[in-house]
Amino acid sequence: MESGNNKKILNENSAPSISDLKYKTQEKITNNNENNDNRLNKKNLIFYSILILILSLLSFLLYNFILRLITQNNNDKNDLGIEEGKKKRKYEEELEKIKKELEEEKKKRKEEFEINKNKYYKEINKTVVGIDFGSSKSGFAFIIFENNNKILIDEITKEIEFKDYIEKSCIIMKDNKMFEYGNKANKRMNKPISKEYIYFDRIKTNLDPKKLEKDSSNIKIKSSFPDNVEMPLKLIIQEYLKGITDDCLEIINKKGHNFTKKDINWVVTVPAIWNEYGKELMKECAIQAGMENIKIALEPEAASLLLFDDTSIDKKYKEKGKIFMLVDAGGYTIDITLNEIVDEQGNLKQLSPPSGNSFGSMKINKDILNLIQQVISEKSLKDIKKDSFDVYNNLLNQIEEIKIDANDDDSDNKDFIINLNSNSCGWFSSSKCIKRTDFGEITYDNNNIYIPKQVIKNLILKRISPIIDHIKEIYKTFNDINIDLLAIAGGFSNSNILKKEIRKYFPNAKVLKNPQISVMKGAVIYGIIPNKIISRKSPKTIGVSSYSLQRPGKECKDPEIVDGEMKCRYFDIFKRKGEDIFNNEIIEKTYTPLKEDQKDIFFILYSSNSYNPTYIDEEDVKILGSFDLEMNETNLKREERKALVRMEFGANINAYAKNKISGKEIKLKANYYNQN
């Protein structure tokens, strides 16, 4: 029987036929093929299922991986944002902290500045002019202020102006008044001039402190031309100062100002060796010349104030604690001061009182003039001065140039030539001659004198030697301290021979920039910051006279019997020699009248070179000044009537005496430094 599939159903007990076998075989083959196909399909299904599963798994893993990456990235971004936020907040907090600290520091510095503003700024309501009144040349520097200007102290020297040339220290007088001064006067004297004009040269050399008396009004000096005409020294100085201050005022007002001399604070410098009389004379002359607001400064101190801002001096010498010696080499004197830099503003502490001597370079001029006199004879030189002063004046100018220009270069053996214009005199030979002098053989002819270079060098070395010795002596005195720098200022410091000789013995020596104007510029700084030198050394022992019992073992020369007791006038010390003197330092002492009926106390201010003087009658004790204080309260007991003596120290000393009962006070002002 066939099925719908054309298959036969066979009896199991029947024997198969070939056709049946074929059929069965074919069927079996068909079934096998079907089974194989089924198995293959199952395998493919399994394979693809596994593949799909794997791919799904991979997709899942990839998805999760990508998801994690995205999540991580977002988390990282979030973390980064959080971190950045933290950093930003921390930065803002630190910034705020810094701002607060800066505000606090600013506030603190502002408070500190208000307390110590003079360390940084200086308020000035007047223009300041510094005048260096020199032996051969003078000049001025200035700084202009008005309407309470404020200036950084560090900027002061940058603002200082000075004249583009230095004036000769000479003057022509006519009818007791200045006709011309300075370079104009000197130039005029290089030509023949009428004898109605009276010429004074190198005025400052007439101010010998040892010859000046307390009353200097009668001191007269002799003119250079006409020869030996006498005029009052004070008149000559004040007229010269009048000329230089008039010039200064004109230059300042050309800058758009309308100042008078009263609108200016003036500072005039003087040598360290000058005594009180010389300083007082200079001050009186300055006032007469119109300088009402006048201060007197010592030349080496003024130059010292400039050192801190001098660009030619290495910064290592300007540090706190550095010690420098300043040598002011001028024409008349050599002045020296020793200072320590005490802070970053360049304030100074004086380690030794300014000292000096008369070893100035003008002595070299005299030596060269003496040499010329030996060549042409003393009479001939006098005749030239008398009859041909223009030739004589030109001769002096040539000598000044030779002194500065002389050098120590052995390769240059040219003679120095001094021209004497033989047309005005007939004492020279028409041919070259040789003259033997104390300085060697000198050649001359009808026009010129030929001075060998070595002769000039020897003359200069002769005068430099005492300067070197004086500096050595100071080094020896202070051998326990290290002097870092030896600074040289003054006009003579331009001498090549002087510079070489000083450096030979003192390798740390440096010449200030523009040394010829260092004193006048330093004088301006002194006028602005007079307390820049915070302490000085007392060059003398200072005190007043008082009565006491005679000291055992030491008798006074003139004892007095008071109330039955032998008493002496002893030296009551206020400040000892060598002690520090601080600006505005005050020392007070109380005294009573010697007798019951005494109606006044006569105080005398004294100085002494001794560290511990006992009596005022000792040899080196000198009077600086005096004042008489009324004590009329005789109804009171002597012990109740008290007088107070107060001394204020600084650049100068001011002494006061006060009646403590009546309150009346009198003042004595005395500049006491370096009394001779």
Stretches found by the model and what they are:
Residues 197-200, 204-213, 219-235, 258, ...:
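Gly/charged contiguous loops adjacent to phosphate- or pyrophosphate-bearing nucleotide/cofactor binding elements
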Residues 170, 299-313, 365-370, 512-548:
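Glycine-rich phosphate-binding/hydrolytic loop that grips phosphoryl groups
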Residues 97-135, 141, 145-150, 197-324, ...:
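Nucleotide/phosphate-binding catalytic cleft detector across ATP-hydrolyzing
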Residues 131-137, 300, 319-335, 340-343, ...:
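A short acidic Gly-Thr/Ser loop motif
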Residues 113, 121, 292, 426-462, ...:
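Acidic low-complexity intrinsically disordered segments
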Residues 80-218, 295-297, 347-348, 354-355, ...:
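Early-domain small/polar-rich strand-loop-helix modules and first-structured segments
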Residues 1-116, 121, 140, 181, ...:
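Terminal export signals
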